[in-house]
């Protein structure tokens, strides 16, 4: 009797997890469809967006704030470069919002020259809004002293730069306004490759549930035969 109850509870849990993954599959499909629609649409003024949801193509007007650059290490998904940094600079819009903008990638050997990239002229930036990154336990902490960041945590950036940053950042499209050849443009193509694996997860849970029943049936037959 106890075995029957354990099997029933386990089977119910496995089936529930399978249906939960099917629900997540539907949600992810809607999310990806909405994201792709936003990314392929013309850029809209940031002020027209009613919330700070990520993956909107926007345009902002304002100026970069000097002496506030962040050097974000790595991320080959945004650039083909191997050993270098993403130049991330706070941008103050004409609406008086301050937003971090990922402007381009530069190699490690050009770290000194890149300080010439920021000026206080007004510009229009077109790019894609991105959510704040979460600190991962397997990554070292950001090296604030040497300005080497591994995670673009916007709360930490706000504290470090002493700025009231928006809760999203922007990946700028195209060549940076500095026209420095050493600052390579970024790409958002990696966003189109976001996977939706929830069907595989659902099939895994359902498969485990079926396996459980098969094992239970074999077990019961052996018990009866004995």
UniProtKB/Swiss-Prot annotation:
Q: Does the keyword Membrane apply?
A: yes
Q: Where are the transmembrane segments?
A: 3-23, 199-219
InterPro entries from the entry? Surf1/Shy1, Surf1/Surf4
Q: Does the keyword Cell membrane apply?
A: yes
Q: Which keywords annotate this record? A: Cell membrane, Membrane, Transmembrane, Transmembrane helix
Q: Which Pfam families match?
A: SURF1 (PF02104)
The main location is membrane
Localization, per the record, is: Cell membrane
Question: What are the annotated GO cellular component locations?
Answer: plasma membrane
Cystine pairs: none
Q: What is the membrane topology listed in the Swiss-Prot or TrEMBL record?
A: Multi-pass membrane protein
Q: Which family does it belong to?
A: Belongs to the SURF1 family.
Instruction: State the protein's name.
Output: SURF1-like protein
- Organism of origin is Rickettsia felis (strain ATCC VR-1525 / URRWXCal2) (Rickettsia azadi)
């Amino acid at each position: 009797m106890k075995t029957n109850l354990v099997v029933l509870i386990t089977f119910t849990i496995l089936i529930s997890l399978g249906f939960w993954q099917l629900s997540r599959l539907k949600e992810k499909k809607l999310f990806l469809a909405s994201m792709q629609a936003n990314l392929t649409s013309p850029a809209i003024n940031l002020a027209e967006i009613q919330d700070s949801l990520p993956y909107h193509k926007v345009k902002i007007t304002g100026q970069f704030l000097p002496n506030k650059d962040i050097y974000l290490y790595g991320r080959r998904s945004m650039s083909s470069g191997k050993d270098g940094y993403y130049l991330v600079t706070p941008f103050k819009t004409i609406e008086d919002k301050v937003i971090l903008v990922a402007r381009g990638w530069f190699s490690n050997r050009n770290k000194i020259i890149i300080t010439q990239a920021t000026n206080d002229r007004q510009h229009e930036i077109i790019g894609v809004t991105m959510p704040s990154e979460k600190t991962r336990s397997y990554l070292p902490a950001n090296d604030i002293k040497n300005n080497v960041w591994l995670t673009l945590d916007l709360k930490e950036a706000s504290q470090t730069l002493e700025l009231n940053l928006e809760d999203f950042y922007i990946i700028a499209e195209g060549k940076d306004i500095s026209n420095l050849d050493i600052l390579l443009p970024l790409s958002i193509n990696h966003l189109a490759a976001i996977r939706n694996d929830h069907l595989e997860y659902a099939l895994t849970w359902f498969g485990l549930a079926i396996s459980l029943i098969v094992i239970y049936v074999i077990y019961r037959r052996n018990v009866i035969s004995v």
